[in-house]
Amino acid sequence: MNPSTALARVLVDELARLGLTEAVIAPGSRSTPLALALVADTRIRTHVRIDERSASFLAVGLARASRRPVALVCTSGTAAANFHPAVLEADQSGVSLIVLTADRPPELRGTGANQTVNQIGLYGSAVRFFAEVGVPEREAGMVAYWRSLVCRAWAAAQANKPGPVHLNLAFREPLVPEPGGQPWPEPVTGRPDGKPWITVDLQRNEPEPVELPWVERGVIVCGDGDYDPIPLLALSAQTGWPLLAEPTSNARRAEALSSYRQLLAVPEFVAAHEPELVVSVGRPGLSRQLLAYLRRAPRHVVVGDPVAFADPVRTATDVVGAVTAPPSATPDTAWAASWAAAEAAARAAADRLLDSDETLSELRLARDLAAHLPAGSLLFAGASMPIRDLDAVMRPRCGLRLIGNRGVSGIDGTVSTAVGAALAHQADGGGEAFALLGDLALLHDQNGLLLGPDEPRPNLTIVVVNNDGGGIFSELEQAGHPDFERVFGTPHGVAVEQVAATAGLPYTRVEWATDLPKALIGDGLRLVEVRTDRAASARLRRALQEAVAAAVR
C-alpha cells in the first residue's frame, strides 16, 4: 500500500467510525486517494459534483438539514478557493463541515508547479480547526497520528460553537492503489471494537435558566437559527409577551405573530407599544423595522452563546444561556390583548388585499405556498425577497421545517443547498421538499441542477419567482437612480423553461393562485415558474403596508 492510499483509507475509516454518513466529492487528480477511499466505503453515501462551489453548498445543505457533519473533498489550487463562500456560510450558520483539500507536497510549493497555491490556513478564522496534515510517510506511528487528528477535527466541528474544520492533505504520487505494493509497517486498522480512535464526549451541559423579571410590556424575538423554539413559545404563553418569529426560527407557530414586519413600520403603533424588555434568541436581521424596535427597549436579554451571541444593533444588556418566566407572570394583560388585536386586524387587511386578485403575486405566492405544503415538508427559502416575503405574510403553522442560508445571506449556492437539504431531509425519513427562490439565485447556481445519472436525486420542487432581475433593490434607496435598471435591476431575459430543459427537468408555469396546489404535486427534481413584475410587486408591498397601517391606526 502506498502512503497516499494509506492516509486516505485510514482517514475515511476513522470518519465513518465517528459517524460520517455523507460526503461530497468535486473531481480532481490530486484528491484521487480520498475519492477512491470514500466511494469504496459502504457506510458513507457519496455525491459527486463537477463544480466546487456547487459541491460545497450541497454539503452545507446536507449538513444543515441533517444536523450532522458532512465531508467535502477537492483537489488542489482554485478548487479549494471555490469552497470559500460555503465555508463562510457554514461558519456564520454553525454548520459542521469536514473540509478535506488535497495539496501538492512541500517540494512542489513555491516552484511554479502546476495547480499549486498556498492552501495553508486558506479559510482563515472561518474554520474551528485547521491542520496541515503533512506528507504521509511509510513509518510506524502514522496511523495513530492520522486517526487522532481526525477525531480532534470531528470534535471541533461539533463542539460548543459548531462549524467547518479544514484538513489540508499533501499527497505525493502514486495517487492510486498499486497491486502488490509494499506492506505497511504497522496495522492500519482502527480500534478492534469498531469505535473511534478517541471517543470525545460532546454532550453540552444544559445552562441553568435565568429567571426573568416580571414586566407587562415584554417582547420575544426569535431570529434565524437551529434551536428548539418550544421554550420560547412556552414563555410567550406564560407571560403574554408577543412572540415575533422570523420564518427560519421555526417558531412561527401557535400564537406567534406573523404581521410584526408591517406593524413595526407604523409609527403610531410603535409609539403606543414601547417595550420594557426584549428577549431575543437566534440571529434577527430580516427586518429593519424589527432591528429599530430593539433599540427602544431599556433592557435586552439575549439568549445565546456567551461569546458568539447575536447583537446586531448593540442593544444587549444581558446574555444568558436560558431563561424562565417569573412566577408572578400572567398572560392576561392589556399589552397582550393590544398586540393580539393588532395582529388580527393586520392579518385580515393583508388577506383582503392579497385575495382581491387571483393572479399569483409574489406576496400571495409566499403566503399560499407556506400554507399549502403538507405536514412533514421542508421548505428552503432563498435570500433577498423570497425570505422577506415569507417573513411578511407567512401565517403560523406546524409541521413545516423552514431553512435558508441566513449566515451570510448570499444568493450563491442556493440551488445546491436546497438539493442537499432535500436529500438529507428525505434520507432521515422526512417528507417532501420545496424551495422558493428568485430568478437570479437560480441563474447564479444553475450547476446545482446538474446531477449525474448515478447521483442520489431528491424529491424537490423548486418554485422560481421570475421577475427578470433583482427584485430586492426595488425596495431600497437606490431604486430611483437613473442607472438603476442596468446596475441593480439587472434584467437578463433568460427563460426558466430553457434552464429546466438544459438540465432535463420537468417544468410547470403557474399564473393563477388556484393552480398553485396542483403544481406542487410531483416527484423528483422539478421547476415551477411564477412570472411577476418587479415594479408591480414593489407597489403591492407598499399597498400591504398602507393597508395594515390603516387597519391599526
From Swiss-Prot:
Pfam families for this protein: TPP_enzyme_M_2 (PF16582), TPP_enzyme_N (PF02776)
The keyword Manganese appears for this protein: yes
Enzyme superclass (EC): transferase
Enzyme Commission number(s) from the entry: 2.2.1.9
UniProt entry keywords in alphabetical sequence: Magnesium, Manganese, Menaquinone biosynthesis, Metal-binding, Thiamine pyrophosphate, Transferase
Keyword Transport assigned: no
Annotated GO biological process: menaquinone biosynthetic process
Function noted in UniProt: Catalyzes the thiamine diphosphate-dependent decarboxylation of 2-oxoglutarate and the subsequent addition of the resulting succinic semialdehyde-thiamine pyrophosphate anion to isochorismate to yield 2-succinyl-5-enolpyruvyl-6-hydroxy-3-cyclohexene-1-carboxylate (SEPHCHC).
Family in the record: Belongs to the TPP enzyme family. MenD subfamily.
Binding partners and assembly: Homodimer.
Protein name, UniProt field: 2-succinyl-5-enolpyruvyl-6-hydroxy-3-cyclohexene-1-carboxylate synthase
Organism: Thermobifida fusca (strain YX)
Lineage: Bacteria, Bacillati, Actinomycetota, Actinomycetes, Streptosporangiales
